[in-house]
């Protein structure tokens, strides 16, 4: 509860922060000790000769720059589509994170302990859902086509985004009246409370599905490509799409803040919703194009095999 204190008179949030800092420092010292022990006891015993070390040094390539990554991605339409998938995912997740944390701060009403408890619960639920989806992910990829499996993540985001953005916009419009959104089992549910809950599960499911579905389908898209594009393309996509995805959402918010200097993050929700619609359109455009390209490669390979057999 807000303002609650421990027996020693220290604020509860401050005390929990001290505990977390102690855990982080202890874990860091443990990692340092483990790293030192591996270098002293394990690595010297490995039977690696000078030729193997030299070959490893040759195989290790330099990470491409942002401009080099863009140039390489533009050479292949498949890589461009994969980079667009990574970019769209990163931007949308950034929108959701910023808006959800803003709604959570309003819902917590300045209670830092409640905010911290929600974030801890969010991490726990995300981990549980990730474990479940990692187990079920293989079955999903076997039972459905590549396009169907790859489209599950954006479809989930679209369905939940309608509720999420809608509740925030409605809550901002009816903030002065203070009217609840609806009543469930005698309990009045406000628009902020609904946005917090929808954003909670939306973020947890989407972030968990990244490891089990999004990354898996993305890696499958590299399979039909030739070896050079496959090896260099992964690094280029990670640099171009990954970095742009992380910074794209922040760039959008910065531009909107410049255009509307007195606007709050909540008041910018309609503009972010419109931007999300545009991003989802690009996402599905890239999925359709990539799906056609993958199936064209597969059909061509099957035709070659049939001709060879004939």
Task: Give the positions of each predicted feature.
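Lipid-exposed faces of alpha-helical membrane segments in multi-pass integral membrane proteins
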Residues: 19-33, 84, 88, 125, ...
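C-terminal structured domains
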Residues: 169-184, 207, 297, 301-310
